[in-house]
Design a protein with these regions (language model features):
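Enzymes that bind and transform nitrogen-containing heteroaromatic metabolites
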Residues: 1-181
Length: 181
């Protein structure tokens, strides 16, 4: 029994993934939803950093499948939150793991099957990548350069990637699926 960790991010062409409200002007191609459904389809757990949890909880907890086809996944799936502090937002099926601990995440992977899905959570994702815990990185690259903001890749760290798949959508977004070499 070993789970895989799949990270999904919306990023700009220059690597910014902070506060992705800038994605709204491009719309959401229905084929992007199909890709996300494929990524989350085998996920039994959502792993989030505390700040991302605090952004996602109020955005998702009251949504229904009629509002967004992704709502049942986000609301019904077990959520584990990594952070030194208790999340300020309540959300069903959420458990706090405590501060980041690579060994605890390794045990989590060994104890589970399927996919552990991660979105946003920059500090957490950088730690997971640095500690060799990420199996897949799904980047939805938007055709815009923002020039400033929190970047996905940690400054000064090199990561070799292996392209697994790619998709191009009518709104100009490109999905790049990578494994870490």
């Amino acid at each position: 029994m070993t789970a895989t960790i799949a990270v999904h991010e919306f990023i700009s062409a220059d690597g910014v993934f902070e506060s992705p409200s800038w994605t709204f002007e491009f719309g959401f191609d229905p084929k992007m939803g199909e890709t996300l459904a494929a990524i989350t389809g085998n996920a039994s757990t959502i792993l989030l950093g505390r700040r991302t949890h605090e952004m996602f909880a109020p955005a998702w907890r009251d949504r229904t499948a009629e509002d967004d086809p992704g709502a049942p996944f986000f609301n019904e799936t077990e959520k584990l939150v990594v952070g030194a502090n208790e999340p300020a937002e309540e959300w069903a099926n959420t458990t706090r793991l405590g501060a980041y601990d690579a060994d605890a995440i390794r045990r989590l992977k060994q104890e589970r099957d399927g996919v552990i899905y991660v979105s946003g959570s920059g500090q957490l994702v950088r730690g997971l990548i640095r500690d060799g815990l990420v199996d897949e990185v799904h980047l939805f690259v938007y055709p815009i350069s923002l020039g400033e903001g929190d970047r996905f890749w940690a400054e000064g760290e090199q990561n070799k990637l292996v392209l697994q798949a790619h998709d191009v959508y009518d709104n100009g977004v490109v999905h790049l699926s990578y494994g870490l070499a």
